[in-house]
């Protein structure tokens, strides 16, 4: 087991990952459904390898990532499950994808033409065709472009059209007008694609929001991303979720210094905070280089220590920050920045709200200077320290 030597760390509850996957699949117990675990961005900052293993253990049958390097990292770690790269992979890398059994996303005729020149007669490249039904990001948008790609795929046996998919832009909102428009487009284009009579194994359109809110809108696969980590796709639909999500990510630190300062003393760079009386000030060994950005300095944020809230004071430094303690504490006492402490909780949603962002971003930006500790059944099963 790896070790780490700093007093700031992330705890990842793999039981939470597995519980969220299990509960999601139960929604589809009466019909065939494949759950694709989305582990891009290093598993949303949780750790792609460990999250993949937990998700597969709980019943996921497919993994997805953003780019080829992420897929290769999973293969290097010994993960054998099917992997879809959802972003663009250069056509020059198709042999690498075939060698490592990695499925690629296709949405350009030019790409298909470039790829075929690099494929051999007996090669089989698994692909998923991406349709842009309203996200405006990547994907085929016009019927004539779909026709051109389908004609090319159908006439070259090197391509195995394993799947067709799209992505919803507003499935996590109360207003479903645009969502329904995308559903309609996808159904129409899917019907058109079926005219080529190719054996398409997977059809997927649902993300976490659509997969949990609208099981009837999903085909035989949905992509389980943010909710797998126990985070709601958006606060406005929390009351519509079919089961409570269990947050897997906690961020903790230990006091590295404690001092009592008199009234009128400045704290941190610029002395932007001045003590209002005699105050106990604690220092934490975490800063913006760890992803705990400077905006925490003036956003009204707190930590938990012994279940009590303590506010940040002064500017966040590169490697350290300061808090105002409710009483005298000892160096080495544990402080919770995200997670639970003595029955109290600071959620990812709370942190995101004070930073005027979304919960997705928070774990993703906690840098890999911060080691990850993985728990199952309340016991540490592994430690990941990317610095050593």
Curated annotation (Swiss-Prot):
Enzyme class: isomerase
Signal peptide: none
One GO term describing the cellular component: cytosol
Record key words, sorted: Isomerase, Pyridoxal phosphate
Reactions catalysed: L-alanine = D-alanine
Cofactor(s) listed in the protein's UniProt record: pyridoxal 5'-phosphate
Protein name listed in UniProt: Alanine racemase
Organism: Halalkalibacterium halodurans (strain ATCC BAA-125 / DSM 18197 / FERM 7344 / JCM 9153 / C-125) (Bacillus halodurans)
């Amino acid at each position: 087991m790896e070790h780490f030597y700093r007093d700031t760390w992330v705890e990842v509850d793999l039981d939470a990952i597995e519980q969220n996957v299990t509960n999601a699949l139960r929604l589809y117990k009466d019909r065939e459904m494949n759950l694709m675990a989305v582990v891009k961005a290093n598993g949303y900052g949780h750790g792609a390898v460990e999250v993949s293993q937990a998700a597969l253990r709980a019943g996921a049958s497919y993994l997805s990532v953003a780019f080829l390097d992420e897929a290769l990292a999973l293969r290097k770690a010994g993960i054998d499950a099917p992997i879809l790269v959802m972003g663009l992979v250069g056509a020059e890398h198709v042999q690498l994808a075939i060698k490592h059994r990695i499925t690629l996303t296709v949405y350009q005729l030019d790409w298909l033409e470039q790829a075929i020149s690099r494929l051999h007669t007996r090669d089989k490249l698994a692909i998923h065709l991406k349709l842009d039904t309203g996200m405006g990001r990547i994907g085929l948008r016009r019927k004539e472009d779909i026709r051109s790609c389908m004609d090319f795929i159908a006439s070259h046996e090197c391509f195995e059209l394993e799947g067709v998919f799209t992505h919803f832009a507003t499935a996590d909102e109360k207003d479903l007008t645009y969502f329904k428009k995308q559903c309609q487009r996808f159904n129409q284009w899917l019907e058109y694609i079926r005219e080529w009579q190719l054996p398409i194994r997977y059809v997927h359109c649902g993300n976490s929001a659509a997969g949990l809110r609208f099981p009837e809108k999903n085909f035989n696969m949905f992509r389980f991303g943010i909710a797998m980590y126990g985070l709601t796709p958006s606060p406005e639909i929390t009351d519509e979720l079919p089961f409570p999500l269990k947050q897997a990510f906690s961020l903790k630190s230990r006091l590295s210094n404690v001092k009592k300062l008199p009234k009128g003393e400045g704290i941190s760079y610029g002395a932007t905070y001045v003590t209002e009386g005699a105050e106990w000030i604690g220092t934490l060994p975490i800063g913006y280089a760890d992803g705990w950005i400077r905006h925490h300095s003036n956003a009204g944020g707190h930590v938990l220590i012994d279940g009590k809230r303590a506010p940040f004071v002064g500017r966040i430094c590169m490697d350290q920050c300061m808090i105002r303690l409710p009483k005298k504490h000892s160096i080495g006492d544990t402080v919770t920045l995200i997670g639970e402490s003595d029955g109290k909780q600071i959620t990812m949603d709370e942190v995101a709200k004070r930073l005027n962002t979304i919960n997705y971003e928070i774990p993703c930006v906690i840098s890999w200077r911060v080691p990850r500790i993985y728990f199952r059944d309340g016991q540490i099963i592994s430690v990941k320290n990317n610095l050593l």
